[in-house]
Amino acid sequence: MGAKKNFVIDTNVILHDYNCLKNFQENDIYLPIVVLEELDKFKKGNEQINFNAREFLRELDLDTDDNLFNKGASLGEGLGSLFVIAGSVDAPDVFDSFPERIPDHKILAVVDWLTRQKKDMKTILVTKDVNLRMKARSIGLLCEDYINDKVINVDIFEKSNEVFEGIDPALIDRIYSSREGLDISEFDFKDIIHPNECFILKSDRNSVLARYNPFTHSICRVNKTKNYGIEPRNAEQSFAFEVLTDPNIKLVALTGKAGTGKTLLALAAALSQMNDYKQILLARPIVALSNKDIGFLPGDAKEKVAPYMQPLFDNLNVIKRQFASNSTEVKRLEDMQKSEQLVIEALAFIRGRSLSETYCIIDEAQNLTPHEIKTIITRAGEGTKMVFTGDIQQIDQPYLDSQSNGLVYMIDRMKDQNLFAHVNLLKGERSQLSELASNLM
């Protein structure tokens, strides 16, 4: 352990992780009173940040006493103390640089004041607000991002699928002829092979799409299969269908840029297994353009979120167009929607539900925090499969990035579990124009 430090916590850290106070080891934590005032504004509502605000304030009330405002309250064994700085503090350097008395500047004032009061200890502002960190550095204050749930190396989650060359062609022939596959011990892989990892095996005369099955410890052939009218256009999409349709894999992550077919593949795979589940649920978080509240939009709650759900309906329409308008397949889809066997809605509307015997697809999962994804997964009951899709480089939430979003966090934590599979889709299949824009712009 290094020298003890003082950390001043910004509101957005608490809204990101209401358990954050437990993650600063033996260091002391300071909360400017303005942080509690800001949390009070977030208490009402059904979004995850509203829950986080309520839960943090509830636990703060249960775990502390009057010492919180003077001597400080202990956070528990092995942890430091928590202090609330009430009232204004003397911080002329801050208000000379930033005269406007907004919450951010009041937080900076506490950091500056504490830095001067506790000269024998480092005082560090912890905030997920990039702009506030820039302001802090501009006046010589120490600051950092909240990194407890950050994934350091995200490049490994964006690589193309492995191609193993120099494989004995006889082994590949045997994979083609064997339904169960070959024991992994017959292969001399130099790299670590994760459970359910998909790859291409090549020799000088043949090749095969394959997957490591952790339940049988075997390398199995991946077939190119059509699912509810959708045929895979490349190896990556074949890999996706492989893990999306395996009943032993309960949790799947599909990543990739726009146009790679993530959501379409997941929905088609779900529909091909409709008889195995009571319901197919397709949802996505609502992230308003420029982070404006959707409350100003006309209509009731369902009507307000309808524009944000349209991309999901677009994927369903793509599948419908694979069949004649009067076909049995299209009629079945329409009946499923009417009976709510197929449901497409905003993620907020399913919060708190227990999901049993459900094929659940969460789109745009890169816009969720690690805690939000954990909350969703823990709702899974018996017979449920959960699929999360997203592009970890296209994040619309202001306090998330490619290292701290819930999707990449889940992949990092689950990558060695037998029930989990991750496929990264690189090749765009929407159109030549879409592929060009994704690569160059």
Name these PLM-found stretches.
Residues 16-18, 338-361, 365-375:
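Conserved RecA-like ASCE ATPase "motif II neighborhood" in helicase/translocase motors
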Residues 247-253, 357:
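Pre-Walker A (Motif I) flank of P-loop NTPase domains
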Residues 3-124, 130-227:
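Active-site-proximal, substrate-binding regions of enzyme catalytic domains
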Residues 259-261:
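Conserved glycine(s) of the Walker
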Residues 41-74, 310-312, 408-441:
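Conserved coupling/interface region of RecA-like P-loop/ASCE motor cores
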Residues 254-256, 266:
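Hydrophobic anchor at the beta1->P-loop junction of P-loop NTPases
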Residues 264-332, 397-418:
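Conserved P-loop
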Residues 229-248:
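N-terminal pre-P-loop "Q-motif" helix
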